[in-house]
């Protein structure tokens, strides 16, 4: 083998081999940039096309369902397909057209260097690619980076083995060769700190190693590579400098007010005027960090700005920016000075800012067929162009900040919307009192568990077309997790029963279930019977406002005063709930603690559930419902049209949104994919 290496080295000096190495680098650069800059935006755009949606819906909801659950799970593994894509692309660029081991070794290093511009392009915030949110590019960035590290490692290992077996280790003293070792060390450190266990527990270490290692690897690869990679280096440095310039130019200092909400949530407020880039769409996000007290610390923060992303819970028209923050390691200092960057737009495909008509122009604005186009609505600052008829949102924990602005905007623009919020503690409901909004469609699920917020999840039940015919399927109960089934399959509905209160025994029973769920029997009520919910399932606070006499005529008495409408009476008054005293087992101390009664203000229109939500066929049928032609107590006018053409056309105007913990977002994505629905996620996962 050593002789073959030596003969190959002699042959590799030829011009033909050098051209092959250069060609593989240019091909890798073109393919990677083409995939990122062209294929990704085109795919995102084509998903919005009605014909493409019809084909994808038929493939996901009808064809794939015939091949069993294992086949569907295999298709839904985005991580697997991304890994295969980049491994096949990198391997093909390094191997195809050459059988010489030395040429292949050199091409491995060349391809790794050629992939770096595309790797850095995927990290730009915000992404310059149309129809693309930069958060959605992070999985692709991770796997492309792993392929780069793998190819660089194989390249270095083969050359090191050759130097060792041929007695030429002295060549490692050359600047170009030991700079290659420096580049490899930077790659390995980046890969090691990028492991989930390190990245989540030691994020600061991960960030600093990632930031420093990026610059070290770019410079070391430039010195090491032969033939030179000047073009790659120019692209890499340009992308990194652009990202630094964009961040610094949109960074400002603000004073933050911290409002405690519960043991797990806090509300941060600062003036909108302090943002350099004002938000245009709801549910954008900003990146924020506590300003260092010393000048050297501030300089360091500008060089290596580690900022935390938070979704803006307020509307773009509000004068105050509000952030709902989970209490963790992020420093919360009332009236403290913070650096804030942004805002970054959410890039939700069905929503766009209205285009103002130019003075003197008679061209009408494009009207959405799903919205009321009254002059008063179009003149409102809350009016947006919305190409959706129904929106189902699922959020967990502090990600309610993503759902609240959308809930208000969609309700205002006449879009049917449901917002499912999964939280751990009912005290988190205090956050609703900080927002004056239309909460119609908000459903809250209190799990009552002691898990971390990132462990919040949602269950989903597999379904088929037979469930729309009312067939009872007792096997569905076995598909639910223990936490879902023990709460009687609390699937959200649009027509559940109501109650005015809950006694102390039932609430205490719920709390006990939360802490001993593993010892309970799995019981599940059939999904078709959920519309007749019993009184232990749901609290619908709209029942406090009786409508029995709403159609009666109003006959004012003589000298009676008409009600005066003020700005405080625009929204319906909230209801107050006094939870009973219940016991909670403290895992840290090992003792049972007792909470005191506390009055909580619950806005009207909110539905409160105890347990873990389950996305089921009933939610899918809600997505199929049409507009009601008038008020109805039975909702019989809102029936789904199961005809194939109308069925797909209706679903093309339905969107499913998810935000929050990764497990919750992934479960919602799979449910939406099985149903062939549009899906958008907002997850700041690391």
From Swiss-Prot:
Residues 108-666 form the Ferric oxidoreductase domain. Its cofactor is FAD. The keyword Transmembrane applies. It catalyses: 2 a Fe(II)-siderophore + NAD(+) + H(+) = 2 a Fe(III)-siderophore + NADH. It is a multi-pass membrane protein. Its main location: membrane. InterPro entries: Fe3_Rdtase_TM_dom, FNR_nucleotide-bd, RBOH/FRE. The keyword Transmembrane helix applies. GO terms for biological process: reductive iron assimilation. Signal peptide: none annotated. It holds the Pfam family Ferric_reduct. The chain crosses the membrane at residues 23-43, 79-99, 111-131, 147-167, 178-198, 205-225, 256-276, 392-412. Keywords: Electron transport, FAD, Flavoprotein, Glycoprotein, Ion transport, Iron, Iron transport, Membrane, NAD, Oxidoreductase, Transmembrane, Transmembrane helix, Transport. Glycans are attached at residues 506, 644. GO terms for cellular component: plasma membrane. FAD binds at residues 308-314. One of its GO terms (molecular function) is ferric-chelate reductase (NADH) activity. Its EC number is 1.16.1.7. It is found in: Membrane. NAD(+) binds at residues 431-439. Is required for the uptake of Fe(3+) ions. May participate in the transport of electrons from cytoplasm to an extracellular substrate (Fe(3+) ion) via FAD and heme intermediates. Involved in iron homeostasis. This is Probable ferric reductase transmembrane component. The lineage of its organism: Eukaryota, Fungi, Dikarya, Ascomycota, Saccharomycotina. The gene is FRE8.
């Amino acid at each position: 083998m050593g002789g073959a290496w030596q003969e190959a080295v002699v042959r590799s000096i030829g011009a033909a081999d050098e051209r092959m190495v250069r060609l593989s680098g240019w091909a890798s650069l073109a393919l990677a940039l083409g995939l990122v800059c062209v294929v990704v935006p085109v795919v995102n755009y084509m998903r919005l096309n009605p014909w493409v949606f019809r084909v994808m819906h038929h493939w996901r909801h009808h064809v794939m369902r015939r091949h069993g659950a294992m086949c569907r799970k295999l298709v839904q593994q985005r991580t697997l397909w991304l890994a295969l894509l980049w491994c096949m692309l990198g391997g093909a660029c390094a191997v195809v057209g050459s059988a010489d081991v030395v040429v292949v070794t050199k091409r491995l290093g060349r391809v790794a260097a050629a992939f770096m511009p595309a790797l850095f392009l995927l990290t730009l915030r915000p992404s310059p690619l149309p129809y693309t949110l930069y958060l959605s590019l992070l999985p692709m960035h991770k796997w492309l980076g792993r392929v780069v590290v793998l190819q660089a490692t194989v390249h270095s290992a083969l050359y090191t083995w050759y130097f060792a077996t041929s007695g030429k280790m002295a060549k490692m003293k050359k600047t170009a060769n030991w700079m290659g070792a420096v580049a490899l060390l930077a790659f390995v450190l980046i890969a090691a700190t990028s492991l989930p266990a390190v990245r989540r527990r030691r994020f600061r270490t991960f960030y600093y190693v990632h930031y420093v290692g990026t610059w070290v690897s770019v410079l070391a690869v430039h010195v090491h590579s032969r033939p030179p990679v000047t073009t790659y280096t120019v692209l890499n440095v340009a992308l990194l400098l652009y990202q630094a310039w964009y961040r610094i130019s949109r960074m400002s200092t603000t004073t933050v007010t911290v409002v405690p909400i519960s043991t797990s949530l806090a509300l941060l407020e600062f003036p909108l005027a302090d943002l350099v880039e004002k938000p245009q769409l709801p549910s954008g996000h900003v990146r924020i960090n506590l300003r260092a007290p010393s000048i050297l610390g501030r300089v360091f923060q500008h060089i290596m700005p580690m900022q935390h992303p938070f979704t803006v819970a307020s509307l773009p028209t509000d004068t105050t920016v509000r952030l709902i923050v989970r209490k963790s390691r992020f420093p919360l200092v009332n009236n403290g000075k913070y650096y804030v960057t942004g805002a970054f737009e959410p890039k939700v495909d069905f929503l766009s800012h209205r285009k103002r008509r130019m003075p003197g122009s008679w061209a009408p604005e494009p009207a959405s067929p799903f919205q009321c186009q009254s002059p008063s609505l179009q003149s409102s600052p809350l009016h947006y162009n919305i190409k959706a008829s129904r929106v189902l949102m699922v959020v967990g924990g502090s990600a309610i900040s993503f759902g609240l602005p959308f809930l208000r905007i969609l309700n205002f623009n006449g879009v049917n919307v449901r917002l499912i919020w999964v939280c751990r503690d009912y005290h988190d409901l205090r956050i609703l009192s900080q927002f004056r909004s239309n909460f119609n469609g908000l459903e809250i699920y209190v799990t009552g568990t002691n898990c971390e917020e990132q462990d919040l999840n949602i269950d989903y039940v597999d379904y088929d077309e037979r469930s729309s015919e009312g067939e009872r399927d007792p096997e569905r109960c076995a598909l639910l997790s223990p936490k879902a089934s023990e709460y009687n399959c609390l699937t959200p509905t649009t027509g559940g029963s109501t109650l005015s209160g809950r006694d102390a025994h039932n609430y205490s029973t719920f709390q006990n279930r939360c802490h001993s769920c593993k010892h309970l029997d799995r019981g599940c009520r059939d999904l078709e019977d959920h519309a007749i919910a019993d009184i232990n399932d749901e609290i619908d606070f709209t029942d406090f406002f009786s409508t029995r006499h709403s159609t009666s005529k109003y006959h004012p008495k003589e000298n009676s005063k008409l009600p005066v409408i003020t700005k405080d009476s625009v929204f319906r008054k909230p209801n107050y709930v006094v939870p009973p005293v219940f016991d909670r087992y403290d895992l840290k101390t090992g003792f049972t603690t007792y909470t005191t009664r506390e009055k909580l203000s619950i806005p009207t229109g909110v539905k409160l559930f105890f347990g873990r939500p389950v996305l089921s066929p009933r939610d899918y049928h809600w997505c199929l419902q049409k507009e009601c032609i008038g008020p109805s107590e039975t909702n019989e006018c809102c029936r789904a049209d199961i005809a194939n053409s109308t069925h797909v056309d209706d679903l093309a105007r339905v969107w499913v949104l998810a935000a929050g913990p990764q497990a919750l977002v992934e479960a919602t994505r799979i449910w939406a994919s099985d149903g062939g629905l549009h899906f958008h996620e907002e997850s700041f996962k690391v």
